[in-house]
């Protein structure tokens, strides 16, 4: 059987799994639709959040912009991550405390102002459409590669799938499908890392492999550590002036 047929089978099974989870966890109340009923286990929430972070609009895009723009691209990474942390710490807990489902509802009731509510709606729309544009583009690129269709068709396929389980299951369905997505993603990320670490250092644990020596062609230690090799990569990419610590912060940003 050709590789393309196996790809179609794998994609079909994964889609069926996500749709099955959405049907199983479909929302039966307004609270379940907006906040998954408030009863999702913290570990499951963490897995869903991690899967959302490892998506086309965040992790892949951040890696891409750093690859194309070099050190200047890290500004977007710090802003994205910092804003995410601030949102999780300063806003999300109070939504639950006030019993609200959306940020505009919380802002409007917190400041007793419909004008503030309108501003929050406008900001939410701008942020959401910006995020969705990147996410859907990434989905289209992935589907165009795997299903051998054009990017526009891939975008529409992704939209139909997301629309199905989002409308049917709400946040509850999305959360549990993201948990399944996390399992797929973490497997896809860890397997290459484990085998690369095993091939380069002879240690199957990537975190421990950082302190090991790079193996030579005969499988013996070369006397050069992995960290030294990574430092050499930083120098080759032009990051040395910003990581060696020999200049002041003012000089680096000037």
Model-derived features: where do they sit?
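Membrane-interfacial segments
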Residues: 25-29, 33, 67-70, 94-102, ...
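Membrane-interface "cap" regions at the ends of multi-pass membrane proteins
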Residues: 1-59, 166-169, 212, 220
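Loop-to-helix junctions at membrane interfaces in multi-pass transport proteins
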Residues: 2-3, 38-40, 44, 61-75, ...
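Membrane-embedded alpha-helical core segments of multi-pass
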Residues: 13, 17, 58, 83-90, ...
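Helix-loop-helix module between adjacent transmembrane segments
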Residues: 19, 50, 74-169, 222-241, ...
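Alpha-helical transmembrane segments of polytopic integral membrane proteins
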Residues: 26-27, 56-59, 63, 88, ...
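Transmembrane helix-loop junctions and nearby membrane-interface residues
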Residues: 19-26, 63, 135, 142, ...
């Amino acid at each position: 059987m050709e590789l393309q047929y196996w790809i179609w089978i794998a994609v079909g099974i994964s889609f069926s799994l996500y749709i099955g989870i959405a049907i199983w966890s479909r929302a039966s109340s307004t609270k379940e639709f907006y906040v998954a009923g408030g009863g999702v286990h913290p570990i499951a929430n963490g897995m869903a959040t991690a899967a959302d972070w490892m998506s086309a609009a965040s992790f892949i895009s951040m890696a891409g912009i750093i690859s194309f723009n070099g050190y200047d691209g890290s500004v977007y990474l710090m802003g994205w991550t910092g804003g995410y942390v601030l949102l999780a710490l300063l806003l999300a807990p109070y939504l639950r405390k006030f019993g609200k489902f959306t940020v505009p509802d919380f802002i409007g009731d917190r400041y007793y102002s419909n004008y503030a509510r309108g501003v929050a709606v406008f900001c939410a729309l701008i942020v959401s459409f910006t995020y969705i544009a990147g996410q859907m583009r990434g989905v289209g690129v992935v589907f165009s590669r795997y299903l051998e269709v054009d990017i526009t068709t891939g975008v529409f396929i992704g939209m139909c799938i997301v629309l199905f389980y989002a409308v049917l299951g709400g946040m509850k369905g999305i959360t549990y499908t993201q948990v399944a997505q996390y399992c797929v993603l973490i497997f896809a990320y860890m397997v290459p890392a484990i085998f690369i670490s095993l091939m380069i250092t002879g240690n199957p644990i990537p975190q421990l492999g950082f302190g090991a020596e790079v193996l030579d062609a005969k499988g013996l230690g070369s006397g050069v550590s992995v960290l030294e090799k990574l430092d050499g990569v930083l120098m080759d990419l032009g990051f040395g002036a910003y990581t060696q610590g020999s200049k002041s912060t003012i000089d680096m940003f000037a």
